[in-house]
Amino acid sequence: MNPSSNIDGDFLIGPDYIPAPELTPVSGAPKGKTETFIMNSADSKIFPGITKVPPDGPANYVPPDLTNVATYPKAYKRTVKVYIPAGYVAGTPAPVIVVQDGPDKNLPLVLDNLIARHRVPAMVAVMIQNGGGDAQGSERGLEYDTMSGRYADFVESEVFPLVEKNCGVTISHDPEARAAMGISSGGIAAFSMAWYHPELYRRVITYSGTYVNQASPTDPKTPHGGWEYHEHLIPQNPTKPIRV
């Protein structure tokens, strides 16, 4: 199809989108279950909640200077959805994948299929909703684009204890049995979890991660934000036991 340059609108030029085969239910595949709970920012010592929108500002407020964004306290609630594979035996340390920007509606089906085909081990998936907003000055940006192990600390000390308490699972402490996964800012967050805490995570799925300078506030140790990984951190440090 060759639409005229004088016409505005949407044009379907193909090819047709074909869903991945992992999204098609496998006949006879055992189905895991999911549990859901809510976390309140008031209960968090690590991420009590921020926003870049002034209390009297419009919802679509854009800070005038993204290199120095003012922030304001803001409470939030986040949903955590936990996938538990079929046949899981309570008390058994389970491999785990931590998924940013959760909950993910397709992941339980994908894991059912992959586990049934023996392509991945039976694992628990912890799908964590971000704290809201996006980019510099937002709670999501603080959690995901900060160049530190702070988010991994949050998962370890505040999320995992609730997962084990509320969902009746035991999470493995073996870093080889732990993975972090994310897209965009969630992608760099997944990598940072392993980079700063390789004793906790050794496997990473990072899709279209924001390896650019979105960190806010600026840290003098990593002034270029996510650029620091390919600019300085990876080439100037010993190889880490991380599979990406």
Predicted regions and their residues:
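Non-catalytic cap/lid and distal C-terminal segments of serine-dependent acyl enzymes
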Residues: 1-244
